[in-house]
Amino acid sequence: THPKDKTDWELYVPDLKEYLDALIFDGFSIVIFSNQSSFGDPKKKEIILSRIEQFVTLMELPIYVFISTESDYCRKPNTGMWEEFFGEKTIDLKESFYVGDAAGRTRNPLTKKKDFSCSDRMFAANLGIKFETPEKYFLEETFPQKEIFSMPKVWETFPTEQPPFDPEDYEVIILIGPPGSGKSSFVESLSDFIVVSRDILRYKAKCIKLMNDVLKTGGKVIVDNTNPSREARKDYLEVAKTYGKKVLAVQINVTKEQSMFLVNYRCKKNKTKRIPDVAIHTYFKKYEKPIKGEGLDKIVERSFVPEGDLTLFQQYF
């Protein structure tokens, strides 16, 4: 049941203080890492903070609390909270462990419902520390392995190589691909093209104006937007036609699951906010496969290929 007010809570086990006291005696630090996106609501924020304060006061123990309030690199299962909290301190990961109820179970033994998430178990996996559910750690209950959601290693679904790209003699390139698919990184390899992007210019009208200005002076243009539909691509194709330019479409083939993964990866790598899921869902809902009949002269398909140090890339997001 949902709590009624800030005082409507109870300890998971009556002797919780003894558990925590013993851990502190053995040299452990007690840290609460919590995702709380509801902090945007002042009333909910007050209630949650009040409960935490009541709990810490009741325990009479040194307990640290780190709360992620945004959908960014600190939100579990990202490890940003841990990194921000501990900084450069050396932590014994072999002895450390994390207890959480977002374990990916298809049936929680207490609530009889599936867990709302798998973020706690993924958080521990990303840190390389042991994970326990509250039921197992405090009550010594276990649950069948078959009741655990699988944690797909999305990073294993990406190709490891692809052929080099040759723009040939094309002066207009239109990119097609969902958020996070590597379009902007691809653009960086084509320094002789002027980038036309709504991420930079915000409005399509400004993009069209810039494209006109570049082409009429003999420059080259690469349109760096998601461009999922024929309608989204139409205006750019018309401008290219006005100047008699051939158009090369570069479609970056990334699945929705991979796009979700890549958006989270970029968020963690750059320590930024995460692109909302709705942007990804919208792309795939509007997507129309590019065809020459809409005015494209050639269509090339590419993939996202991870490069460099893959340590961060090979994490759960």
Predicted regions and their residues:
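Conserved phosphate-donor/acceptor-positioning beta-strand/loop module used by diverse small-molecule
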Residues: 243-263
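Pre-Walker A (Motif I) flank of P-loop NTPase domains
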Residues: 168-173, 218-219
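Glycine-rich phosphate-binding P-loop
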Residues: 173-190
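Conserved substrate/cofactor phosphate-moiety recognition/catalytic segment
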Residues: 185-234
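Conserved GTP-binding G-domain of TRAFAC-class P-loop NTPases and closely related GTPase folds
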Residues: 72-139, 143-154, 257-317
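Short, acidic loop-to-helix structural element flanking the phosphoryl-transfer center
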Residues: 2-31, 39-53, 75-80
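A short, structured active-site edge motif that brings together acidic residues
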Residues: 59-75, 250-255
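Substrate-recognition/cap helix-loop segment adjacent to the acidic, metal-dependent catalytic center
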Residues: 30, 36-67, 86-90
